[in-house]
């Protein structure tokens, strides 16, 4: 029996076709109403007010200023640290030999003290004095190459507390007050820094 002559088969086919058409119509309606389905989600969004946005912007600008201040402060600290390190390096170069030179000063004092003893016509003593004088000159020249200067004021020079150490004060009629009467011991300075002040007697 052919399907064309079967009413029941025709009815089933018709029902199936109607269901397919209904499904397609539902899909079309779904596409057409997509904007309507999205609308509730849009309505749920809350956009911040102008005042709120301005407040957030102000807080962000304040934070930026704080970070900028912290950066500038850190940069200044780094610059100061770098300068201090450079000064310390320069001091090491200029004054690194300070302790060695200080230890050599008693040697110079001993030679000077020996040369201040009364002269003698004895050939051996004279030869010894000449040797001491040459040694002292050599020592002073060597120290000078390393930035050492001798502090040796003359009588009558003004007393300078930065360079001189007053061992005593004496009243001398012909001397001006606060002037040097006598040098007891020479002083030394290294690159402008006093290692030992000259010891002097000052007029009062």
Swiss-Prot record:
Residues 1-55 are annotated as: Disordered. One of its GO terms (molecular function) is protein homodimerization activity. Keywords: Chaperone, Cytoplasm, Stress response. GO terms for biological process: protein folding. The keyword Cell cycle does not apply. Homodimer. This is Protein GrpE. The lineage of its organism: Bacteria, Pseudomonadati, Pseudomonadota, Gammaproteobacteria, Legionellales.
């Amino acid at each position: 029996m052919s399907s064309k002559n079967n009413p029941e088969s025709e009815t089933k086919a018709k029902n199936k076709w109607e269901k397919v058409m209904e499904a397609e119509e539902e899909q079309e309606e779904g596409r057409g109403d997509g904007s309507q389905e999205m609308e509730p989600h849009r309505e749920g969004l809350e956009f911040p007010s102008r005042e709120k946005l301005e407040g957030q912007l102000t807080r962000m600008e304040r934070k930026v200023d704080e970070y900028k201040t912290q950066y500038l402060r850190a940069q200044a600290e780094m610059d100061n640290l770098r300068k201090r390190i450079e000064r310390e390096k320069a001091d090491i170069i200029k004054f690194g030999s300070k302790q060695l030179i200080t230890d050599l000063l008693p040697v110079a004092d001993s030679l000077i003290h020996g040369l201040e003893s009364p002269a003698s016509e004895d050939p051996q003593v004279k030869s010894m004095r000449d040797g001491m004088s040459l040694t002292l000159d050599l020592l002073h020249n060597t120290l000078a190459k390393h930035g050492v200067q001798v502090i040796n004021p003359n009588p009558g020079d003004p007393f300078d507390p930065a360079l001189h150490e007053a061992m005593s004060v004496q009243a001398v009629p012909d001397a001006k007050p606060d002037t040097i009467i006598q040098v007891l011991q020479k002083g030394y300075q290294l690159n402008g820094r006093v290692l030992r002040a000259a010891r002097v007697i000052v007029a009062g």
